[in-house]
């Protein structure tokens, strides 16, 4: 995990954004476009969400073809944080193909904290694309959305996601043992987190 030297608490607290923040979209990185979902994405989404290895550590079953339309439709308008528990879900596009998705889910707006998450097509693993997408996700969370802290929860057996959290500079703050009944067995949970001050320091901002 990357070492971060910024103090966790700055004396000057940044101005708080008004509820209803909507980041400018789409977002373009070196190789990716992060954009709202749209009709026509169903086939690409099905290509990864229907895989057992993708949903193994997620609270979801493999996506069925008949449900792909509803899955995409539910995410079409998930582009702003306007109230407690709202979420932003963006398609990750690479060379005109949706290869995954990223998520920001707010808690209480007054706390300025959000959960982040992701899912990617394993066909594209090993090229740094997940890191590229998640890095831009942090820029949205700590930039336009003005979050104070972001966190991710994952099954510790999901080493790919754990390594991604570590590459992002997130630290493991908690490890809960058999705290959830998950897909027929008791499972553990790891919590990773990062503060805005740490994120800015790591970027030299």
Task: Name every feature range the model reports, one short phrase each.
Residues 1-123, 140, 144, 178-179, ...:
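GNAT-family acyltransferases
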Residues 98-102, 154-165:
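Membrane-interacting alpha-helical segments
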Residues 120, 126-143, 159-167:
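Conserved acetyl-CoA-binding loop-helix of GNAT-fold acetyltransferases
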Residues 144-153:
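Conserved GNAT acetyl-CoA-binding A-motif
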Residues 149, 177-178:
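Short, Lys/Arg-enriched C-terminal cap helix and immediately downstream tail that follows
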Residues 154, 161, 173, 185-188:
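Short histidine
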Residues 166-176:
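Conserved acetyl-CoA-binding loop of GNAT-fold acetyltransferases
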């Amino acid at each position: 995990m990357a070492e971060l030297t910024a103090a966790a608490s700055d004396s000057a607290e940044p101005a708080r954004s008004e509820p209803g923040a909507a980041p400018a979209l789409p977002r373009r990185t070196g190789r990716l476009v992060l954009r709202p979902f749209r009709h026509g994405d169903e086939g690409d989404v099905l290509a990864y969400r229907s895989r057992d290895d993708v949903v193994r550590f997620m609270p979801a079953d493999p996506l069925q073809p008949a449900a792909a339309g509803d899955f995409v439709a539910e995410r079409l308008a998930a582009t702003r944080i306007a109230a407690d528990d709202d979420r932003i879900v963006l398609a990750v596009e690479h060379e005109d193909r949706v290869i995954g998705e990223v998520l920001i889910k707010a808690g209480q707006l007054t706390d300025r904290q959000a959960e982040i998450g992701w899912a990617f097509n394993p066909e594209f693993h090993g090229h740094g694309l997940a890191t590229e997408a998640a890095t831009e996700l942090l820029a949205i969370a700590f930039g336009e959305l003005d979050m104070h802290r972001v966190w991710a929860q994952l099954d510790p057996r999901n080493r790919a996601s754990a390594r991604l959290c570590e590459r992002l500079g997130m630290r493991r703050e908690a490890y809960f043992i058999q705290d959830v009944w998950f897909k027929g067995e008791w499972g553990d949970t790891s919590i990773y987190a990062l503060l805005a001050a740490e994120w800015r320091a790591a970027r030299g901002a």
